[in-house]
């Protein structure tokens, strides 16, 4: 963008563009309503709200560099080189436009169509929400050759906007300190921020995002830093997601167009895996529950591929009926669209409801894919051959499921014989423990509360579904036992489909309970992979948990304490043993089977005392990449990951 264009843009972006919708008081009273929650997720959401403002400037064409810094004191600084928030007088509010943006909820250029055609941010509450939830916030605006500043406490300005210097740059710098009386966690996680910044860089090609952590110095003496920048955007994004998978076709099928007034960008790649991995975004928001844009994409993909295959008489050898699922096996795709007024619905407000979008995406994908298939007959044949193989495997899987249901020794009501069910039939209160090994399963069965806790022992390591064909999973006893115990069906409205249906889910808490060792962690990961690939809705709706049995029982005389970490154990030694390890008795639990039923209940199963880790699907594309890298065929990336995360690997699935 030329300086002249930027100056014209500055002239057009002023106080008159700032629209005000409502006041701030409610935010501090009900923060979760505005940012999702007040734990680690909400804490990081504050950063995303500020960065979204800068991304909006970039989408409008006025900004190409965003710097995000985690400061030593866990405050955050975000600076961009956009036009700077307007500082002129706002007629209606009778104060500076900057103060309006910073102190009034839903005030900002994103609500005035002339300023931004589209804007990011799921909750769209703007930077004022961040201000309200911070003990202190400082805003500096670089605009018109001057530096303007205002500071706030809990959303209230400490003084009017004032000039504090001169400058040759333009942009906005925000620094904020999250309020520890509101947030249960105030320590920022670098990896969580890096994941989102990487995602934003891929979704917005040409924008440089620098992330720096002033709390950590590298071996070379410099602060920890990454620069996220993508020239090719979505093309690079699908390559990144698929980096540990074997490609079926080396091409990335790339679509970047506008249909019916909706900008549509799509990147498609086929690999040799058996999973469908489609990640959809609206205005940079990950629409985990899909919506009309995803429906339009699927419709176009199925119709176009099927027509090409039929026209070229390629389906005659299939001998089975082809369904929509079959066209998507081994597919990795990213769909990114921009919508002026998105309507979000669904359980987590991440499902797009705009009907007009379906036709736009359908048309864009249909036209581009049809052209690609005609121009690349060799690659097209490889894709269609994989579709036929997928259809045959799906039919084999259905037969395997039916066969298991006929043959397997079931307890009453078609449940696995090993399942020790609970007496309650209310899914809201029922819990299912997936327990490693029969001996631990025995202790769990004796120690549980039979009213609402069910136990399903698993024999050894379950099948790694990342490497298995679809029908192989249904030939596995352990996988089938889990599916049947949970009451999961496949297919919607009687259709033979891979889509999991959890409408009749029997337990709203599914708890993985394994030994606190390497083998136990491996089993955790195998089970999480099964859920992520075959019935991700269980994770999306927050029903999957991991139990955390204690590592030690420390005893000194009559004082007993269970310890979950080495730090807790050390604290016990310092408190009761005068710092001497020999002065206390430590029992190290190597497995669940070493605990008697009462101990297992007391430490790991009793809702009053236990600690559960909820498995979140925070970032589907990153989880997709992590699972394929950890559980796939390629050893190199897995070794690198394990070496980098040797002491602590956080699979934020």
Q: Where do the language-model regions lie?
A:
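Helical (often loop-to-helix) elements that flank the catalytic cores of nucleotide-handling enzymes
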Residues: 91, 345-358, 562-568, 572-573
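A short glycine-centered beta->alpha linker in the GHKL/HATPase_c
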Residues: 84-89
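Short adenine-binding "F-helix/F-box" segment of the Bergerat
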Residues: 90-91, 98
């Amino acid at each position: 963008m030329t300086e002249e264009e930027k100056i014209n843009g500055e002239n057009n972006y002023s106080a008159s563009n700032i629209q005000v919708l409502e006041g701030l008081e409610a935010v501090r009273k009900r923060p979760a309503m505005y940012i999702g929650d007040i734990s680690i997720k909400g804490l990081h959401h504050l950063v995303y709200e500020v960065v979204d403002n800068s991304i909006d400037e970039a989408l409008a064409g006025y900004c190409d560099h965003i710097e995000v810094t985690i400061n030593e004191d866990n405050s955050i600084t975000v600076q961009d080189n956009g036009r700077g928030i307007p500082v002129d007088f706002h007629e209606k509010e009778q104060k500076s436009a900057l103060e309006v943006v910073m102190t009034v909820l839903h005030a900002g250029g994103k609500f005035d169509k002339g300023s931004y055609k589209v804007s990011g941010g799921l909750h769209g509450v703007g930077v004022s929400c961040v201000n309200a939830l911070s003990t202190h916030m400082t805003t500096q605006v670089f605009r018109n050759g001057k530096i303007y500043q205002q500071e706030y406490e809990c959303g209230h300005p400490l003084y009017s906007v004032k000039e504090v210097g001169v400058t040759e740059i333009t942009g906005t710098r925000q620094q904020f300190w999250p309020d520890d009386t509101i947030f249960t966690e105030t320590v920022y996680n670098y990896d969580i921020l890096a994941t989102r910044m990487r995602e934003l860089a891929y979704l917005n090609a040409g924008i440089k995002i620098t992330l720096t952590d002033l709390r950590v110095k590298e071996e070379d003496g410099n602060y920890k830093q990454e620069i996220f920048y993508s020239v090719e955007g979505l093309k690079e994004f699908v390559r990144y997601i698929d980096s540990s998978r074997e490609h079926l076709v080396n091409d990335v099928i790339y679509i970047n167009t506008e249909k019916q007034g909706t900008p549509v960008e799509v990147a498609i790649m086929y690999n040799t895996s058996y999973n469908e991995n489609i990640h959809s975004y609206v205005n940079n928001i990950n629409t985990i529950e899909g919506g009309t844009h995803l429906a339009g994409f699927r419709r176009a993909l199925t119709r176009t591929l099927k027509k090409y295959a039929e026209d070229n008489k390629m389906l005659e050898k299939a001998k089975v009926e082809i369904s929509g699922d079959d066209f998507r096996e081994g597919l990795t795709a990213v769909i990114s669209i921009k919508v002026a007024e998105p309507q979000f619905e669904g359980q987590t407000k991440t499902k797009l409801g705009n009907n007009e979008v379906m036709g736009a995406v359908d048309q864009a994908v249909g036209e581009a894919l049809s052209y690609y298939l005609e121009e690349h007959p060799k690659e097209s044949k490889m894709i269609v051959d994989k579709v036929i193989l997928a259809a045959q495997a799906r039919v084999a899987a259905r037969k395997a499921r039916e066969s298991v249901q006929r043959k397997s020794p079931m307890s009453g009501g078609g449940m696995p014989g090993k399942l020790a069910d609970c007496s309650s039939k209310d899914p809201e209160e029922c819990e299912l423990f997936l327990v490693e090994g029969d001996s631990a399963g025995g202790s769990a069965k004796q120690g549980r509360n039979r009213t609402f806790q069910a136990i399903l022992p698993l024999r050894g390591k379950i099948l790694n579904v990342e490497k298995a064909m679809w029908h192989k999973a249904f030939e596995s006893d352990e996988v089938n036992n889990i599916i049947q115990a949970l009451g999961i069906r496949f297919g919607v409205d009687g259709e033979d489909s891979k889509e999991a249906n959890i409408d009749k889910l029997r337990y709203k808490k599914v708890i993985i309970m394994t030994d606190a060792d390497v083998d136990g962690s491996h089993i955790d990961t195998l089970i999480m992979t099964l859920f992520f690939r075959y019935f991700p809705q269980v994770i999306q709706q927050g029903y999957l948990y991991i139990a955390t049995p204690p590592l030690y029982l420390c005893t000194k005389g009559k004082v007993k304490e269970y310890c979950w970490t080495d730090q807790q154990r050390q604290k016990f030694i310092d408190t009761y043993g005068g710092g001497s390890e020999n002065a206390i008795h430590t029992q190290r639990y190597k497995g669940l089977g070493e605990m008697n039923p009462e101990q297992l209940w007391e430490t790991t199963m009793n809702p009053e005392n236990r600690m559960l880790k909820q498995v979140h699907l925070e970032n589907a594309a990153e989880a997709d990449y992590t699972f394929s890298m950890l559980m796939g065929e390629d050893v190199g990336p897995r070794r690198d990951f394990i070496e980098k995360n040797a002491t602590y690997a956080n699979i934020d699935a």
